[in-house]
UniProtKB/Swiss-Prot annotation:
Family affiliation: Belongs to the gamma-glutamyl phosphate reductase family.
Gene: proA
Record protein name field: Gamma-glutamyl phosphate reductase
InterPro entries hit by this protein: Ald_DH/histidinol_DH (IPR016161), Ald_DH_C (IPR016163), Ald_DH_N (IPR016162), Aldehyde_DH_dom (IPR015590), G-glutamylP_reductase_CS (IPR020593), Glu-5-SA_DH (IPR012134), GPR_dom (IPR000965)
Species the sequence originates in: Afipia carboxidovorans (strain ATCC 49405 / DSM 1227 / KCTC 32145 / OM5)
Function as written in the Swiss-Prot or TrEMBL entry: Catalyzes the NADPH-dependent reduction of L-glutamate 5-phosphate into L-glutamate 5-semialdehyde and phosphate. The product spontaneously undergoes cyclization to form 1-pyrroline-5-carboxylate.
Native organism taxonomy: Bacteria, Pseudomonadati, Pseudomonadota, Alphaproteobacteria, Hyphomicrobiales
Length: 428
């Protein structure tokens, strides 16, 4: 399962062009594949993942050992690591995707013009997607399943840290495609660790790639957004906030804040800033801060938060705009809803933000005025996930405002075309 760290430039360019050409041909087949055939492939993939769990764990153990030896952070290792539960989650995600309605060919609108022509707006696949991700090997299964269901071919380029894990997972997906009689090039894995492959994908490979989805840290996403010559679905940061309003229940606030920060601190849906209404602070600030610190979270707070618990360290200006991806949270007492919304607008990343309150009017204002892809009322920010939205999985979360926003599932991986039915009409 070893791959060359670097390939000859000419060989790599030829390799990537060949991958893209085959993916393009596979996309033509998938665009016309019946839902039953795609679902057969998804079922076979899920079965292969479950049956191959020992192989997946062995491959992943090598990746994890290598990452630890190179000094990877605990959050990075957590994103990289597989276990039986995570493999089952991957397989179950494929089962959910299989059960989703097929978006391809769905007529979303139909109308008749005064001249008798009937016009239909119909969902169609995007074509070929390139997914560039870093440490999470489960992204490969999620992206492969969603692209297959939506009739798209996909070229996947995982991080070098997860290369062995990705090879093992990809073998399961390829097996499923074979069993369904679908082209293996429908889900391709870049077979080299050479970082130059990323640049070739970003070029669009002479029009063979239709969309790029980066899944990883800020440096990867920033590079993709700066260099890509094709459309990108992405988010740069997950600098997410939880605002505890003056009308919040303390028990609910404690449950939500703890989950939003500490369930998995390294994922993009983790909360990075806690905002507490000044009117709620006397009763709620000390219990919330103490709970987080007792759970192993470092709290960096303003002067009001520091007064609530001697263990709080001073917050810096940079902390407000930081995605920590670790058990660290910035905390601030704000004057009320208006100041909370203003703070989120200034420092947030338009990803996911939540309000905890029993005041329906305050909740409505927050949901309407916070300009993020996902806004929540009385729920944890860690629900920022396609699987939790009922999409089965997600290929990523987009914070842009064109085409796709929020979790990108099968519907967001389609575009549309217009079918016009006439009876001989000509334009006067």
């Amino acid at each position: 399962m070893n791959a060359p760290l670097k390939a000859d430039d000419t060989d790599l360019a030829a390799l990537m062009a060949d991958l893209a050409t085959k993916a393009r041909a596979a996309a033509r087949v998938l665009a016309l594949a019946p839902a039953e055939q795609k679902n057969t492939g998804l079922a076979a993939m899920a079965a292969a993942l479950r049956a191959s769990a020992p192989k997946l764990l062995a491959a992943n153990a090598e990746d994890v050992a290598e990452a630890r030896a190179s000094g990877a952070t605990p959050a990075f290792v957590d994103r990289l690591a597989l276990n039986d539960a995570r493999i089952e989650t991957m397989a179950a995600g494929l089962d959910v995707v299989r059960g989703l309605d097929d978006p391809v060919g769905k007529v979303t609108e139909r109308w008749t013009r005064p001249n008798g022509m009937t016009i239909e707006r119909v969902r169609v696949p995007l074509g070929v997607a390139a997914v560039i991700f870093e440490s999470r090997p489960n992204v490969l299964a999620d992206a492969g399943a969603l692209c297959l269901k939506s009739g798209n071919a996909v070229i996947l380029r995982g991080g070098s840290d997860s290369f062995r894990s990705c090879q093992a997972i990809h073998a399961c997906l390829t097996q499923g495609l074979r069993e369904a009689g679908l082209p293996e090039a429908a889900i391709s894995l870049v077979p080299t660790r050479d970082r130059a492959a990323v640049g070739l994908l970003l070029s669009g490979l002479d029009g063979r790639i239709d969309v790029i989805v980066p899944r990883g840290g800020k440096s990867l996403v920033a590079r993709v957004e700066a260099e890509a010559r094709v459309p990108v679905f992405a988010h740069l940061d997950g600098n997410n906030h939880v605002f505890v309003d003056k009308a919040a229940s303390l028990d609910m606030a404690k449950t939500i804040v703890l989950n939003a920060k500490m369930r998995r601190p390294g994922i993009c849906g983790a909360a990075e800033t806690l905002l507490v209404d000044k009117a709620a602070a006397p009763a709620q600030l000390k219990p919330l801060v103490g709970m987080l610190i007792d759970a192993g979270c470092e709290v960096r707070g303003d002067t009001d938060v520091q007064k609530a618990d001697a263990r709080v360290t001073p917050v810096t200006e940079d902390d407000w705009a930081t995605e920590f991806e670790a058990p660290i949270i910035a905390a601030k007492v704000v004057g009320g809803l208006d100041e909370a919304i203003a703070h989120i607008e200034r420092y947030g990343s338009h990803h996911t933000d939540a309000i905890v309150t029993d005041d329906a009017t305050a909740a409505t204002r927050f949901l309407n005025e916070v300009d993020s892809a996902i806004v929540l009322h009385n729920a944890s920010t860690q629900f920022a996930d396609g699987g939790e939205f009922g999409f089965g999985a997600e290929i990523g979360i987009a914070t842009g405002k064109f085409h796709a926003r929020g979790p990108v599932g099968v519907e967001q991986l389609t575009s549309f075309k217009y079918r016009v039915h006439g009876t001989g009409q000509t334009r006067p």
